[in-house]
């Protein structure tokens, strides 16, 4: 299990117990200067007070469990309008929306793809790129995915 998966599994019961969806978790930066981002959401959206409540509970849990070596900053926020895509089900949930992908390696000559998300087809994400070409990108090649606000 990766460190991100471990963190997600550790945090999800606390976040859902508070009445929020744990959208995803990111751990960025180098050792000693890391940031743990915890994205939460509800159907009604997220307010500052929601982030504070989750931050307080998650911070206590992380202090006890100590799953991250060294110092780090904790950030709790809504996923925002340019929402990151963490879960396979979100590729169907946001079908029809504009998306941008960063790939782990070249796929059909590119590492970045922008276009309209067409959904998930088994282990492939379907995207109609800006040139109108439909791509089937293996899920395992996607490093990062976000909804795209740019027209």
From Swiss-Prot:
Keywords: Cytoplasm, Ribosome biogenesis
Cellular component GO terms, alphabetical: cytosol
BP GO terms, sorted: ribosomal small subunit assembly; translation
Keyword Flavoprotein on entry: no
NCBIfam families, per the entry: PRK00092.1-1
Family: Belongs to the RimP family.
Protein name in the entry: Ribosome maturation factor RimP
Annotated source species: Halorhodospira halophila (strain DSM 244 / SL1)
Lineage summary: Bacteria, Pseudomonadati, Pseudomonadota, Gammaproteobacteria, Chromatiales
Underlying gene: rimP
């Amino acid at each position: 299990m990766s460190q991100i998966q471990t963190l997600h599994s550790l945090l999800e019961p606390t976040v859902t117990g508070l009445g929020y969806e744990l959208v995803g978790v990111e751990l960025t930066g180098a050792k000693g200067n890391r940031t743990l981002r915890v994205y939460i959401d509800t159907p009604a959206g997220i307010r500052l007070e929601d982030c504070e409540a989750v931050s307080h509970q998650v911070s206590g849990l992380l202090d006890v469990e100590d799953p991250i070596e060294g110092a780090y900053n904790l950030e709790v926020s809504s996923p925002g309008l340019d929402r990151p895509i963490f879960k396979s089900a979100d590729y169907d949930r946001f079908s029809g929306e504009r998306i941008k992908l960063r790939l782990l390696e070249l796929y059909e000559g590119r590492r970045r793809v922008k276009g309209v998300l067409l959904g998930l087809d088994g282990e492939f994400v379907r995207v109609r790129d800006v040139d109108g070409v439909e791509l089937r990108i293996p899920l395992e090649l996607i490093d990062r995915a976000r909804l795209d606000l740019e027209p």
